[in-house]
């Protein structure tokens, strides 16, 4: 019951589902999505990982690998009575075969990846902490 097409959540993925009252904060859904993307961009930049936005309907974030962009962060939301439900998921080291069985967010499964598959060095705990800090700057 969220926006976006079919997705998959599983082990090796960080799923963040905050409940935010946008009406109270006087923000719209686009502002919120932009904020989620910016939080991730800043947190990953603090870990020397550059994320990219794509200019299309399919929101989320990509990393570059061999001159190709691979999606590692997905955003899917539900807006009801001023409240945002659901949120985002980040592919750290999950089994990507699960995406072969679906049409993930309307993309071809070859466009989906994880930090592990792309052999990007990362410290999961540090990224978690940096995401938390960036989230707190924006929403608290």
List each model region and its residues.
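Catalytic beta-strand/loop module used to bind and position nucleotide/cofactor moieties
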Residues: 1-3, 8-11, 18-140
């Amino acid at each position: 019951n969220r926006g976006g097409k079919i997705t998959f959540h599983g082990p090796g993925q960080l799923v963040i589902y905050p409940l935010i009252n946008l009406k109270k904060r006087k923000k719209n859904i686009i502002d919120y999505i932009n904020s989620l993307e910016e939080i991730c961009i800043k947190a990953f930049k603090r870990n020397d990982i550059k994320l990219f936005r794509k200019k299309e309907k399919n929101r989320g974030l990509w990393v570059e690998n061999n001159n190709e962009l691979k999606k590692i962060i997905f955003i899917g939301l539900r807006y009801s009575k001023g409240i945002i439900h659901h949120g985002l998921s980040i592919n750290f080291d999950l089994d990507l075969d699960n995406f072969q069985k679906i049409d993930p967010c309307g993309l071809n499964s070859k466009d989906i990846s994880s930090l592990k598959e792309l052999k990007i060095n990362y410290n999961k705990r540090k990224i978690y902490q940096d995401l938390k800090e960036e989230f707190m700057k924006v929403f608290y």
